[in-house]
């Protein structure tokens, strides 16, 4: 199947942004790598900034759909099982889009108008869905043993770490985060943590 000009630009941009960073990559380099004219980038994305906005939005659109699918199963699974399924789906999504994931997670650490917009839409939705799952669990007497913001912070750290520190993981820990076995093994470790921060009973340990 022939790759479209737009898709070639996207693939080259993701590769170069990962290798050289957004600021260190020029429009000409992207065009050369994609074997297209510089004018094509202006036509499809209005320049490098528009290209980055497209990539970030594309990533979070897919990420958001993963969260929404989990939210649709609230009434059919226990809180822990639902969180575990959500975590596995997120890890799978990140692995299947690992170069894009790495680029986006680096960019969201930088304060900008685009990132503030992402925070107010996609990431607020993410918080809402996590909170909804936990609140539904409380109705079934499944309680977190730590405050919800702390739980979300720790979970997000676990999910993002492999894509923020891939060199550390491969060069220091001698693991291969790009291999499918890694995220499946990593999921098993997150599962242990999730099991450890819940209790069942009549009263929660935290507010």
UniProtKB/Swiss-Prot annotation:
GO biological process: one example: regulation of DNA-templated transcription
Span of domain HTH tetR-type: 3-63
Keyword annotations: DNA-binding, Repressor, Stress response, Transcription, Transcription regulation
Tagged with keyword Transcription regulation: yes
Record SUPFAM superfamilies: Homeodomain-like
InterPro entries: DNA-bd_HTH_TetR-type_CS (IPR023772), Homeodomain-like_sf (IPR009057), HTH-type_Tx_Regulator (IPR050624), HTH_TetR (IPR001647)
GO molecular function (one): transcription cis-regulatory region binding
Protein's UniProt keywords contain Disulfide bond: no
DNA-binding annotation, residue ranges on this chain: 26-45
Induction: By phosphate starvation, via the PhoP/PhoR two-component regulatory system.
Signal peptide limits: none
PANTHER family: ACREF/ENVCD OPERON REPRESSOR-RELATED, ACREF_ENVCD OPERON REPRESSOR-RELATED
Protein name in the entry: Probable HTH-type transcriptional regulator YttP
Species for this entry: Bacillus subtilis (strain 168)
Lineage summary: Bacteria, Bacillati, Bacillota, Bacilli, Bacillales
């Amino acid at each position: 199947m022939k790759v479209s000009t737009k898709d070639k630009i996207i693939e080259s941009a993701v590769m170069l942004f990962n290798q050289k960073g957004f600021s260190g990559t020029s429009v000409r380099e992207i065009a050369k790598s994609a074997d297209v004219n510089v004018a094509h980038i202006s036509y499809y994305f209005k320049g490098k900034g528009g290209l980055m906005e497209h990539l970030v939005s594309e990533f979070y659109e897919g990420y958001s759909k993963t969260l929404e699918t989990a939210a649709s199963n609230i009434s059919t699974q226990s809180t822990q099982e639902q969180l575990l399924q959500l975590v596995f789906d997120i890890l799978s999504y990140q692995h299947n889009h690992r170069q894009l994931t790495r680029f986006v997670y680096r960019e969201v650490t930088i304060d900008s108008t685009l990132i503030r917009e992402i925070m107010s839409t996609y990431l607020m939705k993410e918080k809402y869905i996590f909170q909804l799952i936990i609140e539904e669990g409380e109705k079934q007497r499944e309680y977190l043993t730590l405050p919800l913001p702390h739980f979300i912070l720790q979970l997000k750290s676990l999910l993002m770490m492999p894509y923020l520190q891939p060199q550390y993981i491969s060069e220091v820990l001698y693991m291969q985060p790009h291999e499918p076995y890694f995220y499946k093994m990593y999921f098993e470790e997150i599962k242990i943590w999730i099991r450890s921060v819940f209790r069942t009973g009549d009263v929660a340990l935290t507010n």
